Every structure is written in C-alpha cells, then in structure tokens.
C-alpha cells in the first residue's frame, strides 16, 4: 500500500491550540519579508513550532492585512447567495470572488443566516407562483371580454358614423321596369321574327347584371299575368288555323271565336254519331239535324252523305250498307210444287 498523506505535525511534538501574540508577530514578519510560497517549509524557516496548515489558516483567516472585519453587507450577502446558487458549497471559490472575506467566515454566515433567508424567499415565490397559476385563467378571460366589448363599442360607433360610406360598395341597386301598356290583339298577332343575334361569349354575358360606375345593378323583369280569356282566344285561333282558317288574321271579338269553336266541336260530334248509326244500319240524317244544320252536310259530305263516306278513310273502314232498307222478296211455294 502507498504511504498516502504525511502524518500530522502533532506527532513530532509541535504546538497545538491557540496562537500566541509572539507567534503571530514572527509569522507576519516572515511573510512580509519572504512571502508564503511554500507553507510546508515556512514553519521551520520562520522558527515556529507549528505545522504548515496551521500557519496558512492563521495567516489567511486572521493576520493578512486586507482582511475585512465586521458583519457582511447586503451586497456581500446577495453575492454569496448568487454564487452559492451557481457553485454550490465550494467556499474557497466563493471567497476568491469576495476580496477580504475568508471561506470559513463565508461558510459560517451561510449556515447561520443566509440559508434561512433563501428558504423563506423560496416559500414566498412558491406561494406567489401558486396564486399566479390560478389567476391567469381568469385574467385572460377578463381581458378578452374587455377587449371584445371595446371592439364592439368601437365597431358600433364606427358603423354608426360610416353607415353611409363604408357600406355603399356592398349595396346593390335594384331597378324595376314598369310594364308598358299594350293591346291584347298586338300580343296575338305574330310579328316579324327578330334578326339573328350572335351568340354571346361567357366572358361578355352579364345575365341581367350591369356594372355602372363600379356598382352592380340587378334588373328585375316584371311578371305579366295572362288572364284565362287570352288563353281561350289563343286556343280558338289555333283551332281555326287547323281547319283552313287564316292564322295571321286578327281576332275580331271574343264572343265570335268562342261560338265558332263550339260549333266546330258540335259538328265533329254529329259526324261521329253518323258513323255509329251507319255501322248499326241506322244511317241517315234526321229531319231535325238537316233543318238545324243545313251547312253540315255541305261542309263534310259535299253533295250527299255517300260522297262523304267515300272520301272519309275512317268511314270507309266500316262496311257500307244499303241507302235504305229494301223490302225482302218472299217466295211462297205452293204445296203442289213440292217434289215428290
């Protein structure tokens, strides 16, 4: 095993305990004259019955001229607290940062006074931190509500002051067209077809939206209600056109058109009844029909009902019967003519 550290000086008969004033004067005189380069050799060279460690501690802690006496100032205490937080219990390094103060007295003041002071500060910070942890949840809400109310109030005032200026670009003008006075007969007369217009491109078409001075205007077309009488007039004109009438002729009156259409429907019904009577062998106009509608036969049959029967494809589908039921000839066979 190694020798390790040298044994203590007490084993060779050196002095122990407190220093006497004569020993202090010898140590001070030697260090001022030769310095303290080697603390192990210093006691023998100075003529002291002390070990090197005892001489060093006596010089550093009590005898050096720059040593400060008295209590620590507030600045020194704050410096010790800060350095202890950085370096820990390395008292020699802390003492090197505080001139005039020894590591021993710094350790003593820390253990007796500053340690309790730091503990109280940490408790206060912990209490303040717990209180602040509960308040931020409500503080942002209150600030947010206050900012919201302020923003709303300012927005309301701004909107009230600028209601005529800031919102004008968003508003759209709606133009309504007044319906022009026109005659019903002008609507029924077929006008000249409009000239062919080129197909509008998608980029140029605005679909009833025009931009005038940067403001969009929507044109609302009026809704024209067409009365039922007008539709009846249009239906009557189309029926007359199908039967050879002039489609371009203007309507002279509502009553005349309605009566003409009713007469045409009645004539068509009579014609189908005649076909049914002809199928059943009851063909022939009654005297009331010929007297009531003398022009019906001339319009549909020409000279006679037989001519109409030959010209009508529907009538020729049915088998034609005799014009009048002729009496059948009955042959009476006498009993004498019977063959034996």
From Swiss-Prot:
Keyword DNA-binding: yes
GO molecular function, one term: DNA binding
Species assigned in the record: Zea mays
InterPro entries referenced in this protein's UniProt entry, alphabetically: Homeodomain-like_sf (IPR009057), Myb_dom (IPR017930), Myb_TF_plants (IPR015495), SANT/Myb (IPR001005)
Residue stretches of biased makeup (Low complexity): 133-166
Function of the molecule: Transcription factor that positively regulates genes involved in anthocyanin biosynthesis such as A1.
Segments of the chain annotated as binding DNA: 39-63, 91-114
Record keywords: Activator, DNA-binding, Nucleus, Repeat, Transcription, Transcription regulation
Pfam families, alphabetized: Myb_DNA-binding
Extent of Basic residues compositional bias: 116-126
All residue ranges annotated as the HTH myb-type domain in the record: 11-63, 64-118
A cellular-component GO term for this protein: nucleus
Name used for this protein in its record: Myb-related protein Zm1
Region (Disordered) residue spans: 116-173, 190-209
Compartments (UniProt record): Nucleus
